[in-house]
Amino acid sequence: MSISRSRFRVRLNNADLSRMSSLLIKILILLGVAAAAVFVLFQLGSSAASFTFEFREDVIDLNILNTVRREANVGNLSDVNLEELSTRELLLTMHSHIDNANTMCNRKIRMGYTGDGGWEICDDPDVRPRVPCIIYSFGISYDFSFDDDAAKLYGCHVYSFDPSMRREKDFYDRSSHVHFYKIGLSGTTYVNQDNKWLLMTFRDIREKLGHTNTTVDIVKMDIESSEWEALPEMVASGELRRVKQLLLEYHLVDQTRDYLLPRLKAIQAVESVGFQKFYVHKNHACTVSSVFPVTRTRCYEVHYLKR
């Protein structure tokens, strides 16, 4: 007697298949969770002896950070009455404001050494130096790497200034496009009787070089605190309006009100003619201040552009 195979077939409809698939997925998930739990327990067990919680003194103090946010002026200073700020507010504003860029440069190119001595140039089409172009570089200290690179890349004539380089002639052409002058930048034109350095205003230097009615594409300044004397004259004379990019190092050596207020006013004046910060670099070679919850320095390399 033969028995038809059709009697022993299991007929599964769509609902049965769905329930079986759901059950299989749940089983796989449970197996995965169990495996993960075993792995975590193993890791904890192997490192239990060294696993401890400790207080981190370098964690940002949010109370201090909130104070900085509340009392410091980070944005543009053009509408700020600096005279009304307390000494504490001036200090917080000085460091917080300098350290925050407020415009975009899509393409920055570093000229000079990758470490100290190099500077970023904004290479965006609307501010990029184009032949014929002029660059002033104040503060060389025998390092012409920025000047040489900028001259090679853009084909600009670069005028390098430093009165402290005793081994150099008063004037010479380093190359066909890099020209050195033993002159320093200041707020007035005079000869320093202590070291016999010739110091000149930005306007007088431009007149000396025949650039009175010419736009200067880039001014780079690293002149060891003399920027605080030079900048007000550059703004007051109207000469800074003829500059497209301003790259300078701000040097801060005191925290008193009499020191901070005129320097913040100088920064305010720079911004009043349209300059905005596209890049800021903290120079860690300078002594840092512990007033802030994050690293601060006394030397800020600030890169401005004017569109």
Residue ranges and their predicted role:
Residues 2-307:
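Phosphate/nucleotide-binding beta-alpha loop and adjacent structural elements of enzyme active sites
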